């Protein structure tokens, strides 16, 4: 194996992967620098989710390599990849997948609680993120009492609460109305920038690219284009105490 470029915190080389014999990735390569926001755009079925799952260690590609901080991920055993995801990565998908028996703040704080952070400290950090996502007033509610847009914001808070090195966001605003979608993406990307987090943000909406530094466009499992975003939307400034 040839080591990836030193300035890439996340790197993939010629990834190939199939689902039940159907090709999902056909030789995709990408590098992401520390603190960078990369938008992965393309229509449904283009390979976006498969790429994010390979990069985050959820899937081992059929062929190709995945590296994080200069160490190979694709050769690690399942337990090591699970540990990497818990300790260094955050994930939010298009479905919130909240635990119904937990309140909003407990769901948001779950990554911290699983790491042994005391309940009071975990709750305070979760509340901060819920407030930033305009869902703080519902912190004590269970998912069944929340609107769809509110549940999705709780899921975003959960992905950010532990300040992971990399946040993988797989079409996180897909189920939301346009105004809610824009607010969630602005908050996600501005919070990541203020904390130095790297983000890989997938979306079917071309507007997703407005929030990123670079865009990787996929189609039919292949790279269609890779460009820098010249006129991305300027994110809202982060609070001074963030």
Give names to the regions the model predicted.
Residues 56:
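Helix-to-loop junction immediately C-terminal to a conserved catalytic motif
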Residues 64-72:
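Conserved ABC transporter NBD signature motif
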Residues 73-90:
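ABC ATPase NBD coupling module
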Residues 102-110:
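Short coil-to-helix segment of the ABC ATPase nucleotide-binding domain corresponding to the Q-loop/switch region
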Residues 121-138:
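Conserved ABC ATPase "signature" region
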Residues 142-146, 150:
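Conserved ABC ATPase signature
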Residues 163:
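Conserved catalytic motifs of ABC-family nucleotide-binding domains
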């Amino acid at each position: 194996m040839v080591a990836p470029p030193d300035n890439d915190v996340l790197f993939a080389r010629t990834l190939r992967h199939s689902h039940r014999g159907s090709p999902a990735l056909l030789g995709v390569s990408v590098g992401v620098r520390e603190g960078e926001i990369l938008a992965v755009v393309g229509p449904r079925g283009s390979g976006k989710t498969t790429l994010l799952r390979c990069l985050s260690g959820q899937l081992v590609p059929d062929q190709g390599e995945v590296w994080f901080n200069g160490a190979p991920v694709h050769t690690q055993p399942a337990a090591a990849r699970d540990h990497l995801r818990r300790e260094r990565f955050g994930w939010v998908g298009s479905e919130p997948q909240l635990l119904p028996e937990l309140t909003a703040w407990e769901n948001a704080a779950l990554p911290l609680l699983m790491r042994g952070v005391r309940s009071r400290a975990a709750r305070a950090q979760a509340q901060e993120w819920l407030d930033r996502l305009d869902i703080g007033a519902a912190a004590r509610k269970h998912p069944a009492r929340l609107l769809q847009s509110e549940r999705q914001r709780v899921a975003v808070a959960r992905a950010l609460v532990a300040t992971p090195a990399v946040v993988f966001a797989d079409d996180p605003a897909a189920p939301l109305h346009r105004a809610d979608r824009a607010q969630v993406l602005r908050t996600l990307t501005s919070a990541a920038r203020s904390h130095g987090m790297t983000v890989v943000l997938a979306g079917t909406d071309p507007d997703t690219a407005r929030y990123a530094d670079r865009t990787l466009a996929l189609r039919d499992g292949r790279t269609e284009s890779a460009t820098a975003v010249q006129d991305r939307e300027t994110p809202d400034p982060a609070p001074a105490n963030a």
